[in-house]
Amino acid sequence: MSKQSPTRKLRQTVYDASLKVMFTLRPERIHGIMNKALGVVDGVAPLNRTMEKIIAVHDDSLSQEVFGVTFPRPLGLAAGFDKNASMADAWGAVGFGYAELGTVTASPQPGNPTPRLFRLPADKAILNRMGFNNLGAAEVAKNLRNRKSTDVIGINIGKTKVVPAEHAVDDYRRSASLLGDLADYLVVNVSSPNTPGLRDLQAVESLRPILAAVQESTTVPVLVKIAPDLSDEDIDAVADLAVELKLAGIVATNTTISREGLNTPSGEVEAMGAGGISGAPVAARSLEVLKRLYARVGKEMVLISVGGISTPEQAWERITSGATLLQGYTPFIYGGPDWIRDIHLGIAKQLKAHGLRNIADAVGSELEWKN
């Protein structure tokens, strides 16, 4: 493991203590408090710029052009936190290189009944069955038009719950038409376990017309996000379809419905009910999926790896296993902004240790971590 400075250890101690206090409150209430705090960062431009200068890692070796977009740093916020693009300008200020906002649906919807968000501290994980609660594509588009920064953002779009599967193509097309040109890239989400029947759309015959419709509706790069619970054969099929349609890339992976190997007592997990688990428990499978995708289509499209990337060592392994970009959400909750900084500093240090000028040179290199 990489060593921490005394100052870094102190910040971690303070954050851990704060986290214990926050964890006495309901998860969604904490999310609301964080939203308000980040909303201040989003809305006050001088504060935003000052934080970005102080907190973010500025190293030219981390900057790369990906599908025609310049990403200043490789780690981005994963979809699920900023569902309505209400804090779109805050994410660069806390250190992320970009942010994927959403998931957004064509029509507004409340999501599933509460409680729908649960913590598994023993696993450094979160279980959620939020159900794509959001204000709808038209309202999110208004928020995006009010942005002041030029930070890189992607928009993750999903199916409106009440829309039947046979009308999914039109539903995704509507979202893409409203949001596509307001983002740097779009991600088609067919992999959340919390919308009935959504994962069935990962089947190639269902997925092809959806992806084609989204591509026709926007000029920005289009990617697809897949589940870790797909069989290897289905992963291959989606990858081949992505190549056939000339997608910009694949985001791998979403949350898992598996409950295997958890440290949290099974009775507690069962009491939480249905939902997808994110964080450390999905790390191993996410890495497996990444390696499989890179071997099959890595030379033909961008791979964004997400799922349990908690340490700089894990981040480096994802990069050297074929990921051009990384994402995280749950480790941000457990680690705070220093987690983002640690990841970026760790990658930059490894690039220097291996004599590489740019992160692009490390992608798929299989280079080991150097202490």
Curated annotation (Swiss-Prot):
Binds 1 FMN per subunit. GO terms for cellular component: cytoplasm; plasma membrane. The active site is at residue 192. It comes from the Bacteria. GO terms for biological process: 'de novo' pyrimidine nucleobase biosynthetic process; 'de novo' UMP biosynthetic process. Substrate binds at residues 83, 128-132, 189, 194, 254-255. It is a peripheral membrane protein. It is found in: Cell membrane. Keywords: Cell membrane, Flavoprotein, FMN, Membrane, Oxidoreductase, Pyrimidine biosynthesis. The keyword Flavoprotein applies. It catalyses: (S)-dihydroorotate + a quinone = orotate + a quinol. Its main location: membrane. FMN binds at residues 79-83, 103, 156, 189, 225, 253, 279, 308, 329-330. Its cofactor is FMN. Its EC number is 1.3.5.2. HAMAP family: DHO_dh_type2. Monomer. Belongs to the dihydroorotate dehydrogenase family. Type 2 subfamily. This is Dihydroorotate dehydrogenase (quinone).
